[in-house]
Swiss-Prot record:
Keywords: Metal-binding, Nucleus, Transcription, Transcription regulation, Virulence
Function: Zn(2)-C6 fungal-type transcription factor that has a role in the establishment of the fungus within the plant and/or the progress of the disease. Regulates the expression of virulence factors such as SIX1 and SIX6.
Biological process annotations from GO: DNA-templated transcription
Classification of source organism: Eukaryota, Fungi, Dikarya, Ascomycota, Pezizomycotina
Coiled coil residues, start to end: none
GO (cellular component) term, any one: nucleus
Gene3D superfamilies per record: B-lactam Antibiotic, Isopenicillin N Synthase, Chain (2.60.120.330), Zn(2)-C6 fungal-type DNA-binding domain (4.10.240.10)
GO molecular function ontology, one term from the record: DNA binding
Top-level taxon: Eukaryota
Note: Multiple copies of the gene are present in highly virulent fusarium oxysporum strains.
Ranges annotated as DNA-binding: 137-164
Organism: Fusarium oxysporum f. sp. lycopersici (strain 4287 / CBS 123668 / FGSC 9935 / NRRL 34936) (Fusarium vascular wilt of tomato)
Protein name: Zn(2)-C6 fungal-type transcription factor FTF1a
Chain ranges passing through the membrane: none
Length: 1024
C-alpha cells in the first residue's frame, strides 16, 4: 500500500521501549514524518543507536512536547518488515526474550555473558580468581538485591539516583555454626533463663506437668546414604529427650525417715492450702478484681502484695484460695460490677499471728523451717514479710483512734526497715532503708552494688507509715490521758506538745525532693500509677499539723497565755485545712481518686475549719473557705458510693467505725441467717455470734429489757409524770418576755426519758424533771460556770421539735466517755462527738474551745483578730435562736396520725428547718443545707412517731443564727430561688407559726406586732 495517499492521517507509531516501566512513559512523542522515513528492513544493529543497554530508560527532558521529539522512527515504525526482523512482530513491537516475563510487565534480565563484572580482575587472599562479589554496597544489602560491584557507584544505585557506599570493616567474619548445634543450644539457654526467673514454688508445680514421649523411629526405614554435615534430630536430641521423657513426674525423696505424725501434719497443711477452691469465682473475675485491688486499694494505706508475682501465680493457679478470696472481697467494693461484696478484718488476730510468725524481726532465714532446716529468704520474700507487719501496725493505729482504745503494737518492738520504693520492689532490686526511728540497720558497703543513701530508697509507703505512726503518738497524748499527766504548759518549750508539733512540721520538711509536692512529682507518680498514694501521704501529713494546732485552742482561758502562741496555732490550722482541700481538688482534676477511708476523716476535719472561715468577719478568708468547703463536700459525697454504711453509725469517731460489725457479720447475715445444720465450732467457737449477748448497735437502738422487780415502780411513776406535765401546761407565760426569750412550754413537747438503768446498772434517784446540768460541779469549777451547749440556756427557744426535751437524762451524762480533767473530752476529734467541750460565753474560738466545739455561729462572727483567729461575742450579747442543741428521747409505739392536741402527736414524715441534724442511724440535712447546696444534700424526710415499736433517739441539731441570711454555696446557685438568700429568723418563725397556730407564742407574735420586727436590717446582719 502506498502511504502517500494518506498524508493527512499519516503518523509515526511507537512501540514500548521499556515494557517494565509502563507507568513511566518517556518522551517518545508522535511526529508526522514522510513515508520515506520508514525503512523496509530493520536489523538488530538498530537497537544500538541509543547508546544504552536494553531495558534501561533513556535520559532526557521528560516534559518535552510531542512535536519536539526526535526519536528514531526505524525502531518502532509499523512499516518495517517484521517477518524478516526476528526482534519485532508484525506490529513493530519488540519480541525478543518473551519468555523472561517482560511481556507481562517484568523487568528484563541483563545479559550476563555479554558483560564482564568490574571485580572479575580481583584476587582472593589465596591468590585465586574471585568468583563472587567481595562486598556489596549498603543499599543493595538492605534491599537484598544483587550488587554489580562497580565503583564509585553500582548499577542499582546509579539507576536509583542514590549514593552508593561500601562499608569496609576490619572485623573477621565469625565461623558459621552448625544449624543443628544452634538448635540444640537454644532450648538449653531458654531453660536456664526460665529456671532463674521462676520462683522455687512455681518450679515444684511445673514438675507435675505430663511430658510427651518421643516416638521411636519407624521400623524398616532405610537411612539416607547421602553424606551430610548436619546431624539428624535423633543424633542431636535423642539422649536428652529420652532422659527427659523417662524422668519421673514427681521425684521420690529417698531416705524420708520422718515420723508418721509429722507426715500427717504436713498432709493436713497441704489440704488447707487448697481449701476453698470450690468457692473461687471464675478466672476472669479473679484477674479483674486483682487489677482493681492494685489500682484502688494497694498503697492506701497497706502495701501487702507483690503485683508481678501475685498475677503470675494467679494465672498459674498456685495461690492459696483463701488469699484469692480475700483480695476479691476487699476489691469488690471498688469494682464497677453492681454485685458488691462484704469484708471484715479481725485486727487482733492478725497482729498476734504476725508476731507468732516473727514478722516484726528482719530475718534472713524462714523461721518455719522443718527439722531445723534453714531456707534462705529472697529480697522479695523479706520485703513482703516487712510489708505485712507494717500493715498490721497501720491497722492497729487506725483501730485504736478512739478515746478508750490503747494501742497494742509499740514502736520499739518493730525491728524491721521501712518499705523500699515501689519500683525497687517491683523489679526485685535490694536497697537499704531506715528504721522507724531513722537509724539504718545494715548500711551497705560501696562494693555491694546498692544505693548507699537509705533515705532516697524510701518511697511513699515509708513516709506514709511514719505519718500514721506520728498520728498515733498524737492521739495517745491528746486523747488517752498523756496530756493530763504533762506537768508543763503547752506554750512552754519543754512539754510533749511542742515535741509533737515539731515532729509534724519536720516530717514534712524531711521528705526527699522526689516526694515533695509539686506538679512535676505528681506527673511522675501518675506514670507509676501511684498518684493516689502520693496525694494520700500529703493529706495525712497536713492532718497531723491540723490536729496538733487545733488542740492548742483548749488552753486559751488559762492565765499567762501568750497571744502569739495562739495566733500561730490558728494560722497553722487554717493553712493545713486549705492544703488538704487543695490535694482533694488536685485529685479530682487529675482523676486520681483517693479511696482510703482515713482520707474522708481528714476531709471532714478540714471542712469543720472551713465553716469557721465562712462565718468569719475577715473578708479575705470567706472566698477561700467557701471554695475549699465545696471541694470537701464533693469529695465526701463521692465517698458515699464506697463507704455508704459508715453514715449509719451511732459513733462518728474514725476508730469506732470498726464497731460496725462487732460479731464479724453484717446485719443481713445475722438477723436473717440461712438455715443450715449446726456444726461443731471447735477452737473457733470464741469468735461465734452469741445469741444471748447484745451488740453495741442493738444496745443503742433497741429498748432496754426491764427487770421484773421494777414493773411496779415504773407503773407507779407513770401517773406522777402525767401530773407533772399537766402542771407545766397550765403555767401562764410571763407578760414582759422579749422576742428572743419566747419559749413554748407545751407539755407534749417533753418525751419520756430513756431508761439506761437496766442495761448500765445505774442508780437513778432524782426526779423526772431534775436537770443535772444546773447543779454545781465542785470538782471542776470552770466547767460549772461555763455555758454548756446541752444546757437549757442554750436550747433554741423556738424548738421546732415537739419531742425535744429541755434536759439531758442523768443516765446519759453518767456514761464515761473518757473525759479529761476539765470535764470535757480531750481535743481529739471534738467536732465529731457532741458536747465534747465546755463553752465560755465570753470567749469564742480563741477562748479555749476547738474549731467547732459548742460554738454558735453568731458567737464567732462578732469580730476577728488580724491574724484570722476568731473572737467570741461580748458577754452582754444573748444567745438568741442559734447554735447547737441535743436531745435524748423515748418514743413509744404509736399509730396515730398528725392532728391537734395530745391525741394526734404522732409527728409523721417531715423535714428539719435548720442546717444539720445528726440522729441515731440518720444524717439528716436541714432545709438550709438543701438550699445552700442546691439539693445536693437534701433535707431528708423522716418520721419521729408512727412506728410499731418503741424507739429511742439521740439527736443533735446545728442551727444557723437567728440573724443569718443563708445563701447558696459557690457552684450550687444555678436556678436557686430566692436568689437574694433566706433570712433564717423569718423562715423559722413562719414554720413555727404554721405548725403551732394555737400556741401563746404565735398569738403574742401576731397581737403585739413582733412579727414585723423580722423585716428590720438589724436582724439580718449575718451572712454565713
Amino acid at each position: 500500500m502506498d502511504f502517500t495517499h494518506f498524508d493527512d492521517v499519516a503518523f509515526a507509531y511507537y512501540g514500548l521501549p521499556d515494557q517494565s516501566s509502563l507507568v513511566s512513559l518517556l518522551d517518545h512523542t508522535h511526529t508526522f514524518q514522510s513515508p520515506t522515513a520508514f525503512p523496509q528492513h530493520q536489523a538488530m544493529s538498530g537497537l544500538a543507536h541509543s547508546g544504552l543497554p536494553f531495558g534501561t530508560l533513556p535520559t532526557g527532558n521528560r516534559s518535552q512536547s510531542m512535536e519536539g521529539s526526535k526519536a528514531p522512527p526505524d525502531r518502532t515504525s509499523p512499516a518495517s518488515n517484521a517477518f524478516e526482523n526476528p526482534t519485532t512482530d508484525e506490529f513493530g513491537l519488540a519480541s525478543c526474550n518473551r519468555a523472561d516475563g517482560t511481556d507481562l510487565g517484568g523487568k528484563p534480565r541483563e545479559d550476563k555473558a555479554g558483560a564482564t563484572p568490574a571485580w572479575s580482575g580481583l584476587k582472593t587472599k589465596a591468590g585465586k580468581e574471585r568468583k563472587r562479589l567481595p562486598l556489596a554496597c549498603i543499599a543493595c544489602r538492605r534491599k537484598k538485591v544483587r550488587c554489580s560491584g562497580e565503583k564509585p557507584a553500582c548499577k542499582h544505585c546509579l539507576h536509583s539516583h542514590i549514593p552508593c557506599v561500601y562499608k569496609v570493616t576490619t572485623r573477621k567474619a565469625a565461623p558459621r555454626t552448625n544449624y543443628m548445634v544452634m538448635l540444640d543450644k537454644r532450648p538449653k539457654c531458654m531453660e536456664e533463663r526460665i529456671i532463674k526467673a521462676t520462683p522455687k514454688s512455681d518450679q515444684e508445680v511445673a514438675s507435675f506437668v505430663t511430658r510427651p514421649v518421643v516416638k521411636p523411629a519407624i521400623p524398616g526405614a532405610v537411612p539416607s546414604s547421602k553424606p551430610t554435615k548436619k546431624r539428624g534430630a535423633e543424633e542431636a536430641f535423642g539422649l536428652d529427650l529420652e532422659a527427659w521423657a523417662k524422668a519421673p513426674s514427681k521425684p521420690k525423696i529417698e531416705g524420708d525417715d520422718r515420723p508418721s505424725s509429722l507426715q500427717a501434719q504436713e498432709g493436713e497443711e497441704n489440704k488447707l492450702q487448697h481449701e476453698g477452691t470450690e468457692a473461687l469465682p471464675s478466672e476472669e473475675i479473679q484477674e479483674h478484681l486483682a487489677e482493681v485491688f492494685f489500682d484502688n486499694i494497694y498503697g492506701q494505706s497497706y502495701h501487702l502484695l507483690h503485683k508481678p508475682s501475685y498475677l503470675r501465680k494467679l494465672k498459674n493457679g498456685t495461690l492459696p484460695p483463701v488469699l484469692v478470696l480475700t483480695v476479691c472481697a476487699v476489691a469488690a467494693r471498688f469494682t464497677s460490677n453492681p454485685l458488691g461484696g462484704r469484708s471484715w478484718a479481725l485486727g487482733g488476730q492478725a497482729i498476734r499471728m504476725a508476731f507468732a510468725l516473727q514478722l516484726h524481726k528482719d530475718l534472713e532465714y524462714d523461721p518455719s523451717g522443718r527439722n531445723g532446716a534453714k531456707t534462705q529468704l529472697s529480697f522479695i520474700d523479706r520485703e513482703i514479710r516487712r510489708r505485712i507487719m507494717w500493715a498490721c501496725f497501720l491497722l492497729d493505729r487506725f483501730n485504736s483512734s478512739g478515746t478508750d482504745r490503747p494501742m497494742f503494737i509499740r514502736e520499739d518492738t518493730i525491728q524491721i526497715p521501712l518499705p523500699v520504693k515501689e519500683k525497687y520492689f517491683q523489679f526485685d532490686m535490694p536497697a537499704p532503708t531506715e528504721l522507724l526511728d531513722g537509724q539504718v540497720p545494715h548500711p551497705p558497703s560501696p562494693n555491694d552494688g546498692q544505693i548507699a543513701d537509705a533515705r532516697e530508697n524510701m518511697g511513699v509507703a515509708a513516709f506514709l507509715i511514719r505519718a500514721i505512726a506520728l498520728w498515733g503518738r498524737i492521739i495517745t497524748y491528746l486523747s488517752q490521758g498523756c496530756k493530763d499527766l504533762d506537768p508543763n504548759l503547752l506554750w512552754e518549750e519543754e512539754p510533749h506538745y511542742i515535741k509533737h508539733l515539731n515532729d509534724a512540721v519536720n516530717l514534712e520538711a524531711s521528705l526527699p525532693l522526689s516526694l515533695n509536692y509539686s506538679a512535676e512529682n505528681l506527673e511522675v507518680h501518675k506514670t507509676e500509677n501511684a498518684a493516689s498514694q502520693f496525694l494520700f501521704m500529703h493529706i495525712c501529713l497536713q492532718h497531723n499539723i491540723l490536729l496538733v494546732s487545733r488542740a492548742a485552742m483548749s488552753a486559751r482561758k488559762q492565765q499567762g497565755v501568750h497571744d502569739d502562741f495562739f495566733s500561730e496555732a490558728s494560722q497553722r490550722t487554717f493553712s493545713a485545712a486549705n492544703r488538704i482541700s487543695e490535694f482533694l481538688r488536685e485529685a479530682e482534676q487529675s482523676r486520681c481518686f483517693v479511696s482510703a477511708p482515713f482520707a474522708g476523716y481528714c476531709a471532714f476535719s478540714s471542712a469543720t475549719v472551713h465553716i469557721l472561715g465562712i462565718i468569719s468577719c475577715n473578708p479575705s478568708m470567706k472566698p477561700t473557705a467557701e471554695a475549699n468547703l465545696t471541694t470537701n463536700v464533693k469529695y465526701l459525697h463521692k465517698m458515699k458510693k464506697y463507704w455508704e454504711r459508715a453514715t449509719q453509725l451511732s459513733f462518728l469517731q474514725y476508730g469506732d467505725w470498726y464497731n460496725r460489725y462487732p460479731r464479724g457479720l453484717s446485719d443481713a447475715e445475722f438477723m436473717d441467717p440461712a438455715t443450715h445444720k449446726r456444726k461443731d465450732s471447735g477452737a473457733d467457737g470464741v469468735l461465734e455470734a452469741k445469741p444471748e449477748l447484745r451488740s453495741v448497735e442493738e444496745y443503742s437502738t433497741l429498748p432496754t429489757p426491764r427487770r421484773v422487780e421494777n414493773k411496779d415502780t415504773i407503773r407507779a411513776a407513770a401517773p406522777k409524770r402525767k401530773q407533772s406535765a399537766k402542771k407545766q401546761t397550765g403555767m401562764p407565760a410571763q407578760p414582759g418576755q422579749h422576742l428572743d426569750s419566747l419559749q413554748s412550754t407545751d407539755a407534749d413537747a417533753v418525751s419520756q426519758e430513756r431508761k439506761f438503768s437496766g442495761g448500765l446498772g445505774l442508780q437513778i434517784t432524782g426526779a423526772a424533771g431534775f436537770n443535772p446540768l444546773s447543779a454545781s460541779n465542785q470538782q471542776n469549777p470552770d466547767f460549772s460556770t461555763t455555758m454548756s451547749p446541752t444546757s437549757p440556756a442554750n436550747m433554741t427557744p423556738f424548738s421546732h421539735y415537739a419531742h425535744t426535751p429541755t434536759f439531758f437524762p442523768p443516765e446519759l451524762l453518767s456514761i464515761d466517755f473518757g473525759q479529761g480533767s476539765n470535764g470535757n473530752i480531750d481535743p481529739l476529734d471534738r467536732q465529731l462527738i457532741y458536747g465534747g467541750y465546755s463553752m465560755d460565753a465570753s470567749t469564742g474560738l480563741c477562748g479555749g474551745q476547738d474549731m467547732m466545739s459548742g460554738l454558735g455561729w453568731d458567737t464567732v462572727a462578732s469580730g476577728a483578730q488580724p491574724d484570722g483567729c476568731l473572737q467570741g461575742r461580748p458577754p452582754n450579747v444573748k444567745a438568741g435562736m442559734h447554735g447547737q442543741s441535743a436531745a435524748s428521747s423515748s418514743f413509744p409505739a404509736i399509730n396515730k396520725t398528725n392532728g391537734k392536741g395530745k391525741e394526734g402527736r404522732g409527728i409523721g414524715s417531715h423535714t428539719d428547718y435548720g442546717l444539720l441534724v445528726i440522729a441515731a442511724a440518720d444524717d439528716v440535712g436541714g432545709d438550709m443545707m438543701q438550699y445552700m447546696t442546691n439539693s445536693v444534700l437534701p433535707s431528708t424526710p423522716h418520721k419521729v412517731g408512727l412506728n410499731l415499736r418503741e424507739r429511742f433517739a439521740f439527736a443533735y441539731f446545728h442551727e444557723p443564727s437567728f440573724q443569718a441570711v443563708v445563701r447558696p454555696l459557690p457552684g450550687y446557685d444555678h436556678g436557686q430561688e430566692p436568689k437574694g438568700g433566706i433570712h433564717y429568723g423569718k423562715q423559722f418563725t413562719d414554720m413555727f407559726m404554721r405548725n403551732y397556730p394555737q400556741r401563746i407564742t404565735t398569738q403574742r407574735l401576731n397581737d403585739e406586732g413582733r412579727y414585723r420586727l423580722l423585716d428590720q436590717e438589724s436582724l439580718q446582719t449575718m451572712s454565713p
